[in-house]
Every structure is written in structure tokens, then in C-alpha cells.
């Protein structure tokens, strides 16, 4: 799993926190950030440079003119797919954690209200 990331020398893809991608001249610059360890101020990161792929395509639908376009490298596209899987998994785990905490807080308030209601009923019984 994550063969493209491992081919870049990333031995522990599960430690990836996020990534950024930018274009610089005729290159795409991929920067991968790893989770910070306790006591670290900055996250560890690695940077990769991919040359943009050049293609010649028909400039208009008639076929009389051609123009050169640049697009992302296919290898980089595969790496980004793997990074998206990792980062999306982290986001869904975070969303699940948030949902569980919200459910727990709601349950706390329901139980607190029920306890108050039962205590009020007990007070009514002891007054008689």
C-alpha cells in the first residue's frame, strides 16, 4: 500500500499530516509535512520537485493551429492520490471524534436533566 510514497523514500506514510502543492516555473513543488513530535516547534517536512509535462494540442477545433500546454506529471498525480487517501482518512477520523464528543456532551445533559427530575420527584414525596 502507498507504493508511490514508498518509492519516494517515505517509509511511514501513516505519519503524514498534510501536504502542499505549488507551481514554480516549469516545475510542480510537492511538500509533505509529517506529524510533530512532542516538544517540537516545527513539523518535519520533505520537498520534491516534478517537471511539468509538456503536450502539443490542437489550438482550435478546426485543426489548423497547435499550442503547447503544460500539465501535472502522471507520477505526481499518483502520489497526490495516495496523499489524498491518507489526509482524507485523517479528516474522517477527526470528524468521527468530534461526533462522538458531541454525542457524549448531549448524553451528559440528558442524564443531568433526568437526575434533576428524579430528585424533584423525591422532594415531592418527602414533603408529604
From Swiss-Prot:
<comment type="similarity">
    <text>Belongs to the UPF0325 family.</text>
</comment>
<dbReference type="Pfam" id="PF11944">
    <property type="entry name" value="DUF3461"/>
</dbReference>
<dbReference type="InterPro" id="IPR020911">
    <property type="entry name" value="UPF0325"/>
</dbReference>
<protein>
    <recommendedName>
        <fullName>UPF0325 protein YaeH</fullName>
    </recommendedName>
</protein>
Amino acid at each position: 500500500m502507498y507504493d508511490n510514497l514508498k518509492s519516494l523514500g517515505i517509509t511511514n506514510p501513516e505519519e503524514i499530516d498534510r501536504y502542499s502543492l505549488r507551481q514554480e516555473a516549469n516545475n510542480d513543488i510537492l511538500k509533505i509535512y509529517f506529524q510533530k513530535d512532542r516538544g517540537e516547534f516545527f513539523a518535519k517536512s520533505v520537498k520534491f520537485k516534478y517537471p511539468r509535462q509538456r503536450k502539443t494540442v490542437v489550438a482550435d477545433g478546426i485543426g489548423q493551429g497547435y499550442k503547447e500546454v503544460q500539465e501535472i506529471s502522471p507520477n505526481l498525480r499518483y502520489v497526490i492520490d495516495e496523499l489524498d487517501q491518507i489526509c482524507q482518512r485523517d479528516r474522517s477520523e477527526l470528524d468521527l471524534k468530534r461526533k462522538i464528543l458531541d454525542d457524549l456532551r448531549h448524553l451528559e445533559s440528558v442524564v443531568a436533566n433526568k437526575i434533576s427530575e428524579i430528585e424533584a420527584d423525591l422532594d415531592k414525596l418527602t414533603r408529604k
